[in-house]
């Protein structure tokens, strides 16, 4: 630790205070699943987490093993691949914040979503190809005409002060300059929640592959 020789060095007098970003977790791949709870997933294959494979009528979920507070600004990034299966493929995946981490969400077009989630996003691939934001099981935003049936990189930047979430999507690991979805009025209370993903197939199928994820409090 560097020696601090003045009150300015100790307390930061005379200079602006900055918030240090803190990485809560980082999975560049899933060679290790320590800190995760898997519920009926297809397991890890070649260091990638298959939430489902192309089995019909399947549903899987994965959660962090520890519930924490999200009433602070953060950036969550993940790489998710939907591939293989039938034509048309189905059904997609969800990202959600839940009070529990030991159950599967709904199958088919519910894509593993838990109705108890305080915040959730679904990314559907079957026919409707839509993005939907749910808050306490009530639809807030629905955007059709999307294409999540590919290997995509995602960033979700949450500003707690302005109650705004901006979601960016790209086919490369370079974050776009502009957000694909800007969600206003999105906020977290002081409760502790598990962040997690769900995915499901129905009569039509696809692989739902979580390739990486990282959470940084900003």
Where do the language-model regions lie?
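N-terminal low-complexity, intrinsically disordered "leader/linker" segments enriched in small/polar
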Residues: 1-20
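Polar, low-complexity loop segments and adjacent catalytic/binding residues used for recognizing
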Residues: 19-218
């Amino acid at each position: 630790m560097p020696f601090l020789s003045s009150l300015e060095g100790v307390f930061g007098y005379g200079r602006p205070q900055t918030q240090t970003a803190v990485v809560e977790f980082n999975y560049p791949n899933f060679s290790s699943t320590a800190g995760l709870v898997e519920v009926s997933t297809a397991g890890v294959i070649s260091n990638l987490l298959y939430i489902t494979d192309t089995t019909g009528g399947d549903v899987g979920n994965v959660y962090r093993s520890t519930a924490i507070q999200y009433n602070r600004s953060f950036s969550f990034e993940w790489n998710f691949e939907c591939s293989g299966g039938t034509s048309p493929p189905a059904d997609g995946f969800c990202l959600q914040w839940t009070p529990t981490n030991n159950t599967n969400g709904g199958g088919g077009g519910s894509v593993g979503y838990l109705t108890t989630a305080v915040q959730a996003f679904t990314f559907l691939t079957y026919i409707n190809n839509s993005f939907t934001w749910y808050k306490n099981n009530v639809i807030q935003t629905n955007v059709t005409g999307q294409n999540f049936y590919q290997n995509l990189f995602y960033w979700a930047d949450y500003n707690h002060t302005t109650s705004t979430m901006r979601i960016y999507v790209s086919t490369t690991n370079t974050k776009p300059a502009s957000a694909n979805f800007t969600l206003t009025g999105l906020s977290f209370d002081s409760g502790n929640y598990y962040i997690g993903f769900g995915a499901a197939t129905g009569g039509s199928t696809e692989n739902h592959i979580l390739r990486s994820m990282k959470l940084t409090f900003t």
